Amino acid sequence: MKHRANGIDLFRIFAATMVVAIHTFPFQSIAPFLDEVITLTVFRVAVPFFFMITGYFLLGRLSLNFSYNNNQRVKKYLYKIGMIYLYSILLYFPLSLLNGTISLKMNILLLLKVFIFDGTFYHLWYFPASIIGTILVTLLLRSIGFKLTVAFSTCLYLVGLGGDSWYGITNQVPLLNKLYTFIFSWSDYTRSGVFFTPVFLCLGIFAYRVSKKLTASKILNLLFYVFIIGMTFESIFLHRFTNVKHDSMYLLLPSCALILFLMLLNWQPKLKVKESADLTLLVYILHPLVIVIVHSISKYIPILKNSLLNFLLVVVCSFILAQLLLNLKRKLRVSKQKIPFERASKEISASAIHHNINEIRKIIPKNTNIMGVVKANAYGCGMVEVAYELEKIGISFFCVATIEEAIALRKSGNQGDILILGYTHPNRINDIKKYNLIQSIVSEEHGKVLNLKKIPIRCHLQVDTGMHRLGVTPNVTIIQQMYLFSNLKIEGIYSHLGSSDSLEQESIARTNTQIFLFNNILSDLEQMGISYGYTHIQSSYGILNYPELSFDFVRIGILCYGFLSDYNSPTKIPIDLQPIVKVKASLITERIVEAGEYVGYGLGAKVEKRTRIGVVSIGYADGIPRALSNAKLTLEFKGQSIKQIGNICMDMMLVDLSEVEDISLNDELIVLPNISKIADEEQTITNELLSRLGSRLGTELN
């Protein structure tokens, strides 16, 4: 899919230049009429264009899904614009005092009027207008939906239009005259966040909604010319025959702005401007300051009083100043490159994740989707990093064990569905709703209590088909009752296979019984006319040993991370896996220990000869089993094996460097080079060994 922002980004430069023109009147010395028809008419599309950008990139997604992340994006935007407005107020405070926009003698109501509607300097109205408009449209979208929001915003624009370019006409109507007298007691202009901004935010939202269907069209070009010519004649008529209060709003301006924006979405210029959003924002903020400076200089250099030359100089200087500030920002900014973890870390391979998912997709039916199981910090590998990589390759459904994990994943920016597999106390129901999570109903009582909270939440129904851990009784009457609860939006039903990891006859019999029972429940629900939603019963071993099953989802955990749980248990379907994680730690010091000396805690390790000992910055608090102490663990460095000696400490371990070449302090060693082998030797499964990896380990995604 082509990138829709290229044309938008480049036009930001033109739009910023138009704004400068509006404030400098470039044709005044040559042909003032051109300022009327070009600067104060055609160039008026510039500010609506910027508001439409906000509607498109910020509110478009929100209009379709009021998710936690989309709401957070709006809150962050409002905070950002608020801070920019505050800094801009401080920057222009001396000039605001000089031109009388603000005064220390003003009363509170007048100051509020200036700060909330007019702006403390003539161009700063944009920021409070953006804040007010965004808040207003967000509230309207949430309460009345997109179509009515567009209708309401259009009505507001028409009211504003009557107090702007059409004021000379509306002012003749007594009732309207009283209305605008009241409005102007609160704001100098109707060009504000109440009357002006909302309609253009809505047009940006509309453009977002139709962008995927949008194709290049000559009709768009024709419509733009028709509307821009029509708006020009509208402007000429109003300026010639009426008393225009202001000329920011025209009847045909929304149509011109919308058609222009749709054309720009189709425009894919080869020229790309880096950081165009930041660059044009700085130009917008700084250009009045440049205007003041150029005006002051023009007193001594008369040629600069030529309006066109004045305009060009202001434009060039504004862009140069903005670019210099961006360059300074880059130098002052802390490097985005990750600081190497000096102690210990996990290196996660994105390519290995992609490989494993591709191998899994070869096994499962084409109509079956993958749920990424990222509970227990993605089996110790890093929940946020793994989920981020899975999202990139099309996985949009995730499973966690607890609500705390679910909230952390959502706060990381994850946009997918998040299913909580475990029990969540009903008192946390507000959090389930707030973060748009999907809660498993793990028992009849759990479902009843959640429903009594009278807060609608998304759910999956977990059925106990024979594992006897969590799940409602496999009684179709009880299950039917759950589906009828008014506050539980049950979107799926699932179970968990207790013995799918084994091909022994008793395990196969148990698994087949569970599958049979689950299918019968689905069949009975279907006969009852209940739409039971998504279905899933297989986890990693369920797809390897029962590949013939076909449900809506499979829950993939250990296979995603490149391991089998137990390499001694054969599977019906082989799979080529690549481990995604390497555990690394630094060599932080070394010393020579004489023969006969003990090393580490206790008397378990006594060197028989003069030995070079190193200290590696990782221990059992980081998930390295203490049971591996004293030569049971082998580390690696550049293909060389390094034996661990002595008892593994909480934060460190000792290694024998006697036979190791070319190793220096702060070099990184691979601590668990063969996780599956270690799990086998410790008589456990790789799931346990991985999930032990501690939170102190940093995570590097490569």
Curated annotation (Swiss-Prot):
Modified-residue entries (N6-(pyridoxal phosphate)lysine), positions: 375
Which parts of the sequence lie on the Cytoplasmic side of the lipid bilayer?
1-12, 61-77, 142, 213-218, 270-276, 329-702
Q: Topology: which residues are Extracellular?
A: 34-39, 99-120, 164-191, 240-248, 298-307
Positions annotated as active site in the UniProt record: 375, 601
Which residue windows are transmembrane per the record?
13-33, 40-60, 78-98, 121-141, 143-163, 192-212, 219-239, 249-269, 277-297, 308-328
EC number from the UniProt entry: 5.1.1.-
Keywords, in A-Z order:
Antibiotic resistance, Cell membrane, Isomerase, Membrane, Pyridoxal phosphate, Transmembrane, Transmembrane helix
- Tell me, in one coarse class, where this protein mainly resides: membrane
Q: Which HAMAP family match?
A: Ala_racemase
Q: Entry's PROSITE patterns? A: ALANINE_RACEMASE
A Pfam family cross-referenced in the UniProt record is Acyl_transf_3
Which amino acids does the record list as binding substrate? Answer: 469, 650
Q: Which cofactor does it need?
A: pyridoxal 5'-phosphate
InterPro entries associated with the record: Acyl_transf_3_dom, Ala_racemase, Ala_racemase/Decarboxylase_C, Ala_racemase_C, Ala_racemase_N, Ala_racemase_pyridoxalP-BS, PLP-binding_barrel, Serine/alanine_racemase
Q: What species was this sequence derived from? A: Enterococcus faecalis
An example molecular function term from Gene Ontology annotations:
alanine racemase activity
Give me the Gene Ontology terms describing cellular component.
Answer: cytosol; plasma membrane
Biological process according to GO: D-alanine biosynthetic process; response to antibiotic
Magnesium recorded as keyword: no
Q: Which family does it belong to?
A: In the N-terminal section; belongs to the acyltransferase 3 family. In the C-terminal section; belongs to the alanine racemase family.
Query: What's this protein's name?
Result: Amino-acid racemase
Q: Where is this region: Racemase?
A: 337-702
Lipid bilayer topology: Multi-pass membrane protein
